[in-house]
Amino acid sequence: MTEARKILVTSALPYANGSIHLGHMLEYVQTDMWVRYQKLRGNQAIYVCADDAHGSAIMLRAEKEGITPEQLIDGVRAEHMADFADFGVDFDNYHSTHSQENRELSASIYLALRDKGHIATRAVTQYFDPEKGMFLADRFIKGSCPKCGAEDQYGDNCEKCGATYTPTELKNPRSAISGAVPVLKESQHFFFKLPDFEAMLKQWTRSGALQEAVANKIAEWLDGGLQEWDISRDAPYFGFEIPGEPGKYFYVWLDAPIGYMASFKNLCSKRPELDFDAFWGKDSTAELYHFIGKDIVNFHALFWPAMLEGAGYRKPTAVNVHGYLTVNGQKMSKSRGTFIKARTYLDHLNPEYLRYYYASKLGRGVDDLDLNLEDFVQKVNSDLVGKVVNIASRCAGFIHKGNDGLLVAANPEPELWDAFQAAAPSIAEAYEARDFSRAMREIMALADRANAWIADKAPWALNKVEGKQAEVQEICALGINLFRQLVIMLKPVLPKLAADAEAFLNVKPQTWADLSLPLANHQLNPFNPLLTRIEPAKIEAMVEASKEDLAAEASKPQGNGELAKDPLAAEINFDAFAAVDLRIALIEKCEFVEGADKLLRLSLDIGDEKRNVFSGIKSAYPDPSKLEGRLTLYVANLAPRKMKFGISEGMVLAAGPGGEEIYLLSPDSGAKPGQRVK
């Protein structure tokens, strides 16, 4: 007998900042199917995961909701676990990266890397939000694209033209958190010296640990030269403080993959028979597999194996990469109702339908998978209801009515039984290779053969013929045994259907080894419908509910609440707006106005003319000389106003509620005095 394999399997850790959607579920379902197959074969397969619970995004969301980060991640984790459980994703352990195990492992791995000379420190200059008192990650900086000029773009790439750039290249940068203009500030950062592991990575990435397409992409990065990886962030930050470095925290992507180890270590504390080092030690003979999406390949195929190597741990056996999910041929869309949360799906449909559809489309490659909702309905109704379950529903009634539910010992078609037996190794091979679509095709081909044979024998017709009842029982006995084989083969994909079928068949939980053992002279339990057809109306209701989710989110207070404080004015037509002559003005001189509590006097250059303006911005600019030399926006055709202190010839533009919160508006660099604002 072959010795059972020791296998540890992980999926990427979902971020503890939002709900699970069907795109996420693609990964967890396929991982779960592979683990269930391994367990069905008698292997020791252990599936661990955790919530990725650190980072600025979590800290800021908790602050916005008026709760602690710990309260936020605890609530999200409970939601995630409920969604996974209801989808049949059966983790052996589901933990959190905000755990004592992860804190200890992250510290020990960092210290091992540092002590071996793989950590560097140097000063970096990055944007700092003076209002929030925090350094800004690229995604928390917005401005105009330096290439195409598109506004409201992130600090690292333009969603309009696709350009990539550094935050310092962004035009008119602002903090996406507070709206403040960020300032450049220097800070000491810690770097993992990834180039130290270039030779090892070149060998490991070509060892069969990656799919060929992924290995080819990694080779491009390796050929381009590896860079040191910034593994630190400055306070305030929700995460683990770097040992011996007050105010410095591990970047979330350092402790996130260590979360795989931490979750397994947590499981070891619950199951004493498990040995942490037997799975993670340098000389471990266990197998280690990571299932991930193609968007995080660089972390898992470069940084992670290098960290493990440097800290004295084993490397993954393989990193299995999959593509993205599209719906109806397009990116998931909230407005179209195709950005479907796992819970919204569960409110309308059986999760096993989607598990089967994903399996029918998942191959070994990294291509995207399309959830075509019309095809989904057709495939589930045709394959699961019309083929697999149909065999049992055709045969069970005759056995219960004609023989009190007793399955006779008979095999009236040995060739068909043998064909099922002969197909099992190929189906097993497809499961092992994660070629789930091939496995489903081969299983459905067997279901077609079984249905065709039963249709040819027509037990419903024979049952009406005197003296043919025994033959009917033999036909239906083989039909039920073929159904049982199909259920065992589908058990990794459809665990709930398998459990319900096992209850009907009156058998213990089946394993792959049970495929070769037919039931004979065996009492069945009453048959109840195992699956029902999908009604298109349920799909429509799910899509509409997903749109409602969007509407509900849209109704929540968004942004900074400024519009609620000061609602938008009544709509005007274009001619009314065009009548306002906005110009660029240079502030040549700015000074206090004697006897005025709120006013500053601004002497403006608008190109060919000079203008004098009084503006109520004194409270925000206690040193008016600092405004001199600045460009601002000026209403040039506003009728002059006679004031106590002189005549004001127009108005400069500023934003803010008043007091110290007044912000004089400025144009982009390159604008010239006198130019019209359009």
From Swiss-Prot:
Manner of cofactor binding, per the entry note: Binds 1 zinc ion per subunit.
Key word tRNA-binding present: yes
Catalytic activity: tRNA(Met) + L-methionine + ATP = L-methionyl-tRNA(Met) + AMP + diphosphate
Aminoacyl-tRNA synthetase found in the keyword field: yes
Major localization listed first in the record, in broad terms: cytoplasm
Record field: transmembrane: none
Function: Is required not only for elongation of protein synthesis but also for the initiation of all mRNA translation through initiator tRNA(fMet) aminoacylation.
HAMAP family: Met_tRNA_synth_type1
Protein name, entry field: Methionine--tRNA ligase
Organism expressing this protein natively: Ectopseudomonas mendocina (strain ymp) (Pseudomonas mendocina)
Lineage: Bacteria, Pseudomonadati, Pseudomonadota, Gammaproteobacteria, Pseudomonadales
